[in-house]
Amino acid sequence: MQMIPGDPFSISSSMGGFVHQETHLHHLQQQIPDLNPNSNPNPNAKPNSSSAKKKRNQPGTPDPDADVIALSPTTLMATNRFVCEICNKGFQRDQNLQLHRRGHNLPWKLKQRSKQEVIKKKVYICPIKTCVHHDASRALGDLTGIKKHYSRKHGEKKWKCEKCSKKYAVQSDWKAHAKTCGTREYKCDCGTLFSRKDSFITHRAFCDALTEEGARMSSLSNNNPVISTTNLNFGNESNVMNNPNLPHGFVHRGVHHPDINAAISQFGLGFGHDLSAMHAQGLSEMVQMASTGNHHLFPSSSSSLPDFSGHHQFQIPMTSTNPSLTLSSSSTSQQTSASLQHQTLKDSSFSPLFSSSSENKQNKPLSPMSATALLQKAAQMGSTRSNSSTAPSFFAGPTMTSSSATASPPPRSSSPMMIQQQLNNFNTNVLRENHNRAPPPLSGVSTSSVDNNPFQSNRSGLNPAQQMGLTRDFLGVSNEHHPHQTGRRPFLPQELARFAPLG
């Protein structure tokens, strides 16, 4: 076997036909360059594809060797710079005019440049002095560009889109917009759709700002739970009433609404009952009864209400010997009733002070009462007190109000007999002090409206002593059962003689 030394492809002479082919293939592989794109035999070589491209100057950065041309606005925007003297047809370029002159068999001449002539570029500046492109260093490169710039920035927008009402100063811009108007939609993250890109960009800026502000406020609320509670519970008094950590009688009174719901919440906490389920109709009936002169309805319905004699708004000097005086039905009486109704609602806000102070001593919450039960109890108490035909407790004199204003809150339970005896004591003192002098007239009060009060009977025909009727202490035993009451005495013989016709 003959071997070819140094040849890795050498084989035996029996395969001599293939040796020549393999040698020739190996020689060709060394001469043909590597066609693998991943391999780079010369890593220092740089691709010249980008350098072969001619870079275009950015707008506003002209060639410093270019000729700067300044045109007036009239010349710049003129549509017919070159006019034919035969047909008055205008052309924007002189070359077009020369070709047109050839049609009239006129001499024409086209500009021809010699090979030695150096072609210099021309740049155009904006005719507006305040424009940034008025400077030669910011000149625009061609005549068409300076015309469009002047029209867009300083010209009138003559073309208007019928779909979106957007106006354009350049007709080509208007045509390009008309092709795509309404075909594309820009959707914001908040779900709003826009057909115009500029409107979408403006909205997106505000929307992102609002989103960031909302995220910042939510982070502050999460870091400070007090702020979040304050922001989320405006006017929510149910949370305050149902909060077991707050003391009894605590009311959030940051905002007072004049509607009936605010009155229900105030009366509910003032009485010490849970009157959240009270119907508005029942409360309106109570307010209406109070406005017609039934002023003893509220003090007698619950002991948690403040004593009206202790508030100086209701201090009316009572020097008349006729204890059956009531508010008249005139316009003055209506104004007084309205003011008393408003003051009743206003003073009910002070009731938690009395209820909380008394409940510190007695931790016995009152049972809830419905509106119907409350009205029935008020009517029962009013009918019991109507036997005395006297004024309400807040018509007491200055001596009585001064003592009650500094006294402790009224007791929890007040029977009709105790109230009746207090009123009789007051009437006795009035009769004793003002027996020999005439009563001065009381403004806004008359005796002709006795029938207007459903809780009082008509006793206008009786004198003050006879109107006391059977409520006098004939036996003089009141001090035995009630030693804390003073000023009670039995009847004198001459006083008993006045009641003889009643028997």
From Swiss-Prot:
Ranges for the region named Disordered are: 32-68, 301-417, 432-465
Question: What InterPro entries does its record include?
Answer: C2CH-3rd_BIRD-IDD (IPR055187), C2CH-4th_BIRD-IDD (IPR055185), C2H2-2nd_BIRD-IDD (IPR055186), IDD1-16 (IPR031140), Znf_C2H2_sf (IPR036236), Znf_C2H2_type (IPR013087)
UniProtKB keywords: Activator, DNA-binding, Metal-binding, Nucleus, Phosphoprotein, Repeat, Transcription, Transcription regulation, Zinc, Zinc-finger
Bias kind Polar residues: ranges: 381-392, 444-465
Q: What happens when the gene is disrupted?
A: Ectopic divisions in the ground tissue (GT) region leading to an additional layer at the root pole of mature embryos and seedlings and associated with increased numbers of cells in the circumference within each root layer. Impaired SCR expression in the quiescent center (QC). A low level of SHR moves one extra layer outward from the endodermis, correlating with ectopic divisions in the cortex.
Q: Where is Zn(2+) 2 annotated to bind? A: 188, 190, 203, 207
Q: Motif Nuclear localization signal 2: which residue numbers?
A: 146-153
The answer to whether UniProt assigns keyword DNA-binding to this entry is yes
Induction line:
Not regulated by SCR and SHR.
Chain sites annotated for binding Zn(2+) 1 = 161, 164, 177, 181
Q: Indicate which residues form the motif Nuclear localization signal 1.
A: 100-107
Zinc fingers (C2H2-type): which spans? 82-104, 124-154, 159-182
At what positions is Phosphoserine found?
Answer: 72
Q: What GO biological process terms are annotated to this protein in UniProt?
A: asymmetric cell division; positive regulation of DNA-templated transcription; protein localization to nucleus; regulation of cell division; regulation of DNA-templated transcription; regulation of epidermal cell differentiation; regulation of meristem growth; root development
Q: What function is annotated for this protein? A: Transcription factor that, together with BIB, regulates tissue boundaries and asymmetric cell division by a rapid up-regulation of 'SCARECROW' (SCR), thus controlling the nuclear localization of 'SHORT-ROOT' (SHR) and restricting its action. Binds DNA via its zinc fingers. Recognizes and binds to SCL3 promoter sequence 5'-AGACAA-3' to promote its expression when in complex with RGA. Confines CYCD6 expression to the cortex-endodermis initial/daughter (CEI/CEID) tissues. Required for radial patterning and stem cell maintenance. Counteracted by 'MAGPIE' (MGP).
Q: How does it assemble?
A: Interacts with SHR, SCR, MGP and itself. The heterodimer with SHR involves its zinc fingers. Interacts with SIEL. Binds to RGA and SCL3 competitively in the nucleus.
Q: What other facts are recorded? A: Early initiation of expression in ground tissue is SHR- and SCR-independent but later maintenance becomes dependent on both.
Q: List the protein's name.
A: Zinc finger protein JACKDAW
Species source reads: Arabidopsis thaliana (Mouse-ear cress)
Taxonomic lineage from the root? Eukaryota, Viridiplantae, Streptophyta, Embryophyta, Tracheophyta
